[in-house]
């Protein structure tokens, strides 16, 4: 009886229904092929450092810093285009939250975004890379979680504090040795994802901001959870005369000093903007101008949605929806085709 029903179903509107089944099969095959295709990149940061070394850079020079693109499509693409076109910028540093989570396809999408970027691009690991199997995948693609390199008169140290607690004991030992070596250089730059402290004051702002704060006070503890570790790191950086600290994690722009050491939080590379403060909550990246004696950090703003909390919430929802559609477009097509088939089957059975 079932075979008869299937034959009867295919007999009606035969061409259309066979085409639908063929499309479902083809889309499923393409989706599987895409998923099992190797990502290609291996030890990305090591290769980027080698490219920088081959350039023989001397001071003065300029590099870019940004963070929290988190699978953003439109904003991050525009950011990369501007950085690539800027002749002053020789290389770039992405401070983490490269992806929304550790899903393989989200890493594939990020790699597709940066594979055509003409300048060396280095990364730090963010907390979103730790989700699912992301930590192991990050290591295979980008290499060690913390590392160092030199450019001209400057020493660059990239740390892993993505667990939001602090550094592991072996990373502490490594950091102290690196800071000792860095004393031979004029400038010492530190990069990590999670800031030592959250510079935002939840008691300030307009009524809209206070409502958002009341609904989610955790947002204002977007820093290392272990205050002792944060204090210890701040004192260590001050003791070794660090020139500048760069962090992200907070989707905004902040600058100031931790134990006398200048810091900049730059989390405006495309992830959702929660706040609506015109002085801080906008898309942006940094240009860091390194001279023989001085360092200047220049803020470069990008097109940003209006500063209204309702529009910001809609924009945040659209950022996630757009990224999901771009990354999982094959699966979405497959889902729509299957739904169409089920609706057609339901109508056919209902007529009988």
Where do the model's predicted regions map?
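N-terminal Lys/Arg-rich, disordered targeting/topogenic segments
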Residues: 1-18, 351-352
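Hydrophobic membrane-insertion alpha-helices, especially the h-region
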Residues: 19-34, 335-338
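N-terminal active-site segment of His-dependent metallophosphoesterases
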Residues: 28-109, 199
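Short, solvent-exposed beta-strand-terminating loops
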Residues: 35, 192-205
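A short C-terminal boundary segment appended to hydrolase-like catalytic domains
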Residues: 40-48, 254-259, 279, 286-352
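Extended active-site neighborhood of metal-dependent phosphoesterases/phosphodiesterases
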Residues: 40-46, 51, 55, 104-188, ...
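Hydrophobic beta-strand anchors of alpha/beta hydrolase catalytic cores
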Residues: 63, 92, 156, 188-189
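Active-site glycine-centered loops adjacent to acidic/histidine catalytic or metal-binding residues
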Residues: 68, 96-97, 126-127, 193, ...
